């Protein structure tokens, strides 16, 4: 049974988990702000030496080199970097230029497809950006859409207004009866509405009983506002990175 450390270097956080050949467990995350190498070292302190360390990164080379230095210092283990390809794990990349597709989105659609290869899949990932991707039966990745996430929407509003409230807490009912609640409710419900519309536009008529997957750091907050049947899959990207690494040898 493999014992791999999987790293997802996203825009806001570094997510990690252990892959045992079947599922991801012992997951965690550290923010890029502050002393992230020290925080990661502490988070991994009790971990047994992994057989392999795998990373998918939306960042440039410097971040990957820093992660490899940590891996070599702690375990003497090199890093396997996963990148987007034209095809992998039975999925054909439908982008005109496959290199433009972020590796996190690629990993998520690969993981979704491998869970049910004969089904249509809609993958909604709500992090710094919100993405919606569609993959059809037999691994036909159709493409997707990108939309600002909760914090980006709030920041855009805050750049032109004063007293931006915290987005923490549950989504407030609308119509709101205070300006902070109106902003919070508008951002949260607005993003949920955009995602519902994108999902309905992107699934073709022949997509009967599609599987809907919800992942990303802010996805849990939006789940009650999205169509029923969306399955919360917080480790979908990590799972996909592990599957891509397994195929790469």
Curated annotation (Swiss-Prot):
<feature type="active site" description="Proton acceptor">
    <location>
        <position position="104"/>
    </location>
</feature>
<dbReference type="GO" id="GO:0004594">
    <property type="term" value="F:pantothenate kinase activity"/>
</dbReference>
<keyword id="KW-0173">Coenzyme A biosynthesis</keyword>
<feature type="binding site">
    <location>
        <position position="125"/>
    </location>
    <ligand>
        <name>K(+)</name>
    </ligand>
</feature>
<keyword id="KW-0418">Kinase</keyword>
<comment type="subunit">
    <text>Homodimer.</text>
</comment>
<feature type="binding site">
    <location>
        <position position="128"/>
    </location>
    <ligand>
        <name>ATP</name>
    </ligand>
</feature>
<protein>
    <recommendedName>
        <fullName>Type III pantothenate kinase</fullName>
        <ecNumber>2.7.1.33</ecNumber>
    </recommendedName>
</protein>
<dbReference type="InterPro" id="IPR004619">
    <property type="entry name" value="Type_III_PanK"/>
</dbReference>
<feature type="binding site">
    <location>
        <position position="95"/>
    </location>
    <ligand>
        <name>substrate</name>
    </ligand>
</feature>
<keyword id="KW-0963">Cytoplasm</keyword>
<dbReference type="GO" id="GO:0005737">
    <property type="term" value="C:cytoplasm"/>
</dbReference>
<feature type="binding site">
    <location>
        <begin position="102"/>
        <end position="105"/>
    </location>
    <ligand>
        <name>substrate</name>
    </ligand>
</feature>
<keyword id="KW-0479">Metal-binding</keyword>
<dbReference type="GO" id="GO:0005524">
    <property type="term" value="F:ATP binding"/>
</dbReference>
<comment type="function">
    <text>Catalyzes the phosphorylation of pantothenate (Pan), the first step in CoA biosynthesis.</text>
</comment>
<dbReference type="GO" id="GO:0046872">
    <property type="term" value="F:metal ion binding"/>
</dbReference>
<dbReference type="Pfam" id="PF03309">
    <property type="entry name" value="Pan_kinase"/>
</dbReference>
<keyword id="KW-0630">Potassium</keyword>
<comment type="similarity">
    <text>Belongs to the type III pantothenate kinase family.</text>
</comment>
<dbReference type="InterPro" id="IPR043129">
    <property type="entry name" value="ATPase_NBD"/>
</dbReference>
<keyword id="KW-0067">ATP-binding</keyword>
<comment type="pathway">
    <text>Cofactor biosynthesis; coenzyme A biosynthesis; CoA from (R)-pantothenate: step 1/5.</text>
</comment>
<feature type="binding site">
    <location>
        <begin position="8"/>
        <end position="15"/>
    </location>
    <ligand>
        <name>ATP</name>
    </ligand>
</feature>
<keyword id="KW-0808">Transferase</keyword>
<dbReference type="GO" id="GO:0015937">
    <property type="term" value="P:coenzyme A biosynthetic process"/>
</dbReference>
<feature type="binding site">
    <location>
        <position position="179"/>
    </location>
    <ligand>
        <name>substrate</name>
    </ligand>
</feature>
<keyword id="KW-0547">Nucleotide-binding</keyword>
């Amino acid at each position: 049974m493999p014992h791999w450390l999987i790293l997802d270097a996203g825009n806001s956080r570094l997510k990690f988990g252990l892959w045992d050949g079947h599922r991801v467990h012992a997951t965690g995350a550290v923010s890029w702000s502050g002393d992230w190498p020290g925080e990661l070292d502490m988070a991994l302190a009790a971990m047994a030496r992994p057989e392999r360390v795998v990373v998918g990164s939306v960042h440039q080379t410097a971040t990957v080199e820093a992660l490899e230095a940590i891996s070599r210092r702690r375990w003497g283990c090199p890093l396997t970097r996963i990148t987007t390809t034209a095809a992998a794990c039975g999925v054909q990349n439908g982008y005109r230029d496959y290199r433009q597709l972020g590796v996190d989105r690629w990993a998520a659609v690969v993981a979704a497809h491998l869970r049910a290869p004969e089904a249509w899949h809609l993958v909604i990932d709500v992090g710094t950006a919100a993405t919606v991707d569609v993959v059809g039966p037999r691994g036909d990745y159709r493409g997707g859409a990108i939309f600002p996430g909760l914090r980006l929407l709030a920041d855009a509003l805050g750049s032109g207004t004063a007293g931006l409230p915290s987005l923490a807490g549950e989504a407030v009912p609308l119509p709101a009866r205070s300006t902070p609640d109106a902003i919070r409710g508008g951002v949260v419900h607005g993003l949920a509405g955009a995602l519902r519309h994108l999902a309905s536009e992107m699934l073709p008529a022949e997509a009967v009983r599609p599987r809907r997957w919800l992942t990303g750091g802010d996805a849990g907050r939006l789940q009650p506002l999205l169509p029923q049947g969306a399955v919360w899959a917080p480790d979908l990207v990590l799972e996909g990175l592990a599957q891509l690494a397994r195929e790469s040898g």
